[in-house]
Amino acid sequence: MKLISKIVLVTVILLTAGSVVVNAQNKIATLDLRKVFDSYWRTKQADIQLKERAKEFEKQRQEMIDSYKSANDEYKKLIDSANDSAITADEREKRKKDAEAKLVEIKGIEANITQFDRTATTTLNEQRKRMREKILQEIYELVNTKAKAAGYTLVIDTAAETINNTPVLLYYTKDNDLTDEILKQLNANAPTEYLQPQSTETNAPAK
């Protein structure tokens, strides 16, 4: 029993000593990455560009939809005219063939719309991904530079969440928070139209 107590005591001492060493060697800073990303003027610029691109796609799609509706109207008229009892058999046959050709055209427009939707979605997603990666890389590089200059060995994202959508950090102080400093430098040369007054409070962790 005494032996077990001694072992437990030694273990506690070693763990405590190790904790002291780790704390002495590490200087930790915090950063609300979601707030930095959302408030960075280039993110706002990218959002505007994506919306403009989406509007262009929507305009093209609407033109295709209009063509589709027009073709359907023409098809219905051809079917009605082909059933006209006053026309000759040859004329009826001709109109039926015209209706069949118009139906093929309609099917082609449908296929084009489906392909267009797929291509537009892929294009927008890829553009969004490229912009996001580029912006995050700029943020990471600045954080890395700032952290090294200030002697920080670790920068923790306070907006991070677990797979269960709960905060990774339940408590932390803002003594070494880099959020506002990083944002100030990122937006130092921002065009005025992209700047808005920044809140001093951090946003909720990103989901």
Which role does the model predict for each range below?
Residues G18-A24:
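Sec/Tat signal peptide C-region and signal peptidase I cleavage site
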Residues A24-K207:
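Amphipathic, charged alpha-helical segments and their helix-to-coil junctions
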Residues M1-L9:
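Bacterial N-terminal signal peptides that target proteins for export
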Residues V8-G18:
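Bacterial N-terminal signal peptides
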